[in-house]
Amino acid sequence: MKPLYLFFVVLGTLCSSFAQTGKVMDELKLNSKILKGERKFAVYLPPDYETSSRSYPVLYLLHGYTDDQTGWVQFGEVQHIADKAINEGTATPMIIIMPDADTGLPGYTNAISGNWNYEDFFFEELMPHVEGRFRIKKKKQFRAVAGLSMGGGGSFLYALHRPDLFSSAAPLSAWMGPQTLEEMNDFAKRENMKFEEKNFNAFLEHNNPLKLVDQMSKETLNSVRWYIDCGDDDFLYEA
C-alpha cells in the first residue's frame, strides 16, 4: 500500500507542475494628459498568452478605497484564482486590467470640483492604451467590469454610463460615493477637496445608480449581465 500511496503523491506533484501559470505585472505606467501625470496599473496575462497569437476577453477589475493597482494582486490573489479557474476550465482565458484609482483624488468618477476627471481618463486614455498594448478583443461581448467597495461603485457606474462597452458587470459590496450633501461635505473634508454646493445636484444626477436606471430603457439595461453581491451584515448593504 505504501508504494501505491507514494506513486499517487508523485503523480499529483507531476500533474501540478504541468499546470500553467499566468503572469502579473503590477507597476506598469502610462502618462495621462487628462490627470496631468503618470498613472500606474496592473495586468494579469493568462497562462497561454506568451505562447499563442490569439486575442482575449478583458476584465477591468477595480480596487476599493485606500487600495491601489496592487490591491487585487496582493490581497485578492488574482493570479492564483484566475490561474486555477482557467486551468480547471471554469473560466475562459482572459486579460485582467487593474488601474490605480487612489493616487491623487481617490475614486472612479469625475470629481465634483471639476479638476480631477478620472472617469474621462479611464475611457479616453486607459482603455485605448491597454487594448492597444495587449491582445484584447475590443467588442462589447468580450469586455466586463467588476470591483469591490469603491471599485464596486465604479463598476456599477461605468456599466450604467457606458452599456455599449460592457457585456457584464459585477459590483461587489458597492460603495456608491456621497449621495447626500452632508456625505459630500464629509468626503471633501476628509480628502481636503473643495467644491461648490451648487454643483452637487448635477454630480448626483450623473452618479446615482437609481436615477441612471430610471433613465435607461429596459432593453439597454438588460444588454448588460449583472451580478450584484453584498453580505447581509455588510455596512454597505444599505447602499
Question: Model-found features: residue ranges?
Answer:
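Non-catalytic cap/lid and distal C-terminal segments of serine-dependent acyl enzymes
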Residues: Q20-A239
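Bacterial Sec-dependent N-terminal signal peptides
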Residues: M1-V24
